Amino acid sequence: MGLTIRRIRDWVFTIPFLLGFGLALVVFDVAGRIVRPFGLRPFERVMAALQWTLIAVFRICGTKVSVERSPLVAAGTGYAVVANHQSLFDIVLIGGLLFSNYPKYVAKKELGRFIPSISLNLKHGGNALIDREDRTQAVAAIAEMAATAQARDVSVVILPAGTRSRDGRLGPFRRGGAEAMLAAADCLPVVPAVIDGSWRLLRNGLMPVPFGTVVRVRFGEPLSRHAGDAADVGERAEREIRRTLAAWRAET
């Protein structure tokens, strides 16, 4: 198929995708505001449904999601998830695939404004909004989120690379935030999560979305914990993520 034809095909499917994506954000923003007075758990269920819906919307563009999940990663249980970061779709993937674990996220404070559903969830769903220029505030917010999540037996997620990868290559991990999260949630097993291919979805800034992108996701076996192991278990998770990515790349 020629480049021009592929580009036309991408746009043909991107237009209904963008309409569906925007509609989902607006509808679930309204739903979230309606249920929020009834407590955090109803709100979490609405946001979980949103993330499942957004995964389905990406299928309009022929996106295929291949998932490997350790049988030891159980539903309805709290985990500390350490993942690599390739695109904004990563959060949707983790939230949708671990919906029953009600994952909480670390996000830059700018995302807490003006984005239907997403900003609402980040502000009111027990997540950590951080100022990346203020390390003290960031670490404190992450630790508070993690401690609260552990007390409720829900999951926390951090993407230590911070900046999204533009080409799928894994950059250096920033360990400060991850160690703060793992120290505050020291009873939660650590799950290394690996995502590959999501960077291709947004390489054109959604204008258009490449048709037929394959995204692989792996939730590895939970890593055992012991007292004071935040730095060590974080490094083990990073090694597992890098090892899995290298193995996947070797297959192609």
What do these predicted regions represent?
Residues 29-37, 43-46, 60, 75-134:
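Catalytic core of membrane glycerolipid acyltransferases/transacylases, capturing the structured
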Residues 138, 145-146, 156, 161-169:
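Soluble extracytoplasmic domains of inner/organellar membrane proteins
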Residues 227-252:
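A cross-taxonomic marker for long C-terminal extensions/tails that follow the last structured domain
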Residues 116-120, 155-157, 166-232:
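A cross-family acyltransferase "interaction/gating" segment
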Residues 3-66, 120-121:
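A transmembrane-helix-recognition feature enriched in membrane-embedded lipid enzymes
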Residues 61-68, 139, 200:
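Short gly/ser/thr-rich secondary-structure transition/capping motifs
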Residues 1-3, 67, 250-252:
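Soluble, non-transmembrane catalytic domains of enzymes that act on hydrophobic metabolites at membranes
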Residues 123-148, 153:
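A membrane-cytosol interface segment of integral membrane proteins
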